[in-house]
Amino acid sequence: MTTVMGTEAETMTTTWTLSGFGDEIDPDPAVQAAVLQSLGAGCIEVRSAWGVNIVDLDEDQLDALAAVFEERGMAVSAIASPVGKVDVTLPADHEVERLGRAIRAAERLGTRYIRLFSFFRGEGVAVEDIRDDVMARMRALADAAELAGVVLLHENEKDIYGDTPERCLDIVETVGSPALRLAWDSANFVQVGVAHPFDDGYALLRPHLEYLQVKDARSATGEVTPAGEGDGQVLETLTALRDDGYTGFASLEPHLTDVNALGGFSGPAAFGVAARAFRRLTDRIGVELA
């Protein structure tokens, strides 16, 4: 009997772990988990629960949140903290203390990743003028993360210091900590005028990328769109990540209907639209989502 063996390409399928910002679906974490699982995700990124930011949940609330996820068999990919999403003139200790609360949540919910930002500046203040203060704060945060054994994921949020590829690189190279890595967000790059995020930023940042946040945007209006429907070169980015051997998280953050104090919101229906758009892209390039 002759056995036909599969090719190497057929046997070495790339798999990424699908996650998503649960509070974009509903304030109730039980609903968040149910919808994510219905879309094929086994993980959740936690930004808030019951309308309360993750760093403001008390011990009882964290225990209740952990119980919800444990009951449903849902793992936590990252804590989507608000650390660093404040004016740089606030005392450094302010954000170090909030990071401590995010670390507490990460430990309780069983993840090593914590999303953070690199500070806003006042109106009329040049970005170059806040660099030293930003770096001092990012070093302090990275030091705290190293001590706790967690990894900080810097998101390229619009209008913070690190909102362009060049300044994201500046942060990780200047701080130089293994506890500070990068999350890639194509839409945010588009919204600050990076015309071609993949062409302009991928090679620069790939050595430091550890996490993928999934959304897209149109350059003419800044409108957020499902992945592949904007100008963020999402397909090119996904293809390169596949070819580079990326095997980490892909976290849906659609922002399709609203932006509020806790972040973006989509609702179950729009979140599903975003999830299916992303899956069409990964199917196209032969990446499995688990």
Where are these regions (language model features)?
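Active-site acidic/histidine proton-transfer and metal-coordination neighborhood
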Residues: D28-A34, V68-R72, D87-L182, Q191, ...
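Short, solvent-exposed loop/turn segments at secondary-structure boundaries
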Residues: V55-E59, V88-D93, V125-I130, G193-H196, ...
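Histidine-acidic metal/acid-base catalytic patches
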Residues: T2-S19, I25-G42, A66, E70, ...
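N-terminal small/glycine-rich loop or linker at the start of catalytic domains
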Residues: G6-S19, V76-V86, S118-R121
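Active-site-proximal loop/turn and secondary-structure-junction residues that shape catalytic pockets
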Residues: E24-D26, S48-W50, P82-K85, S118-G122, ...
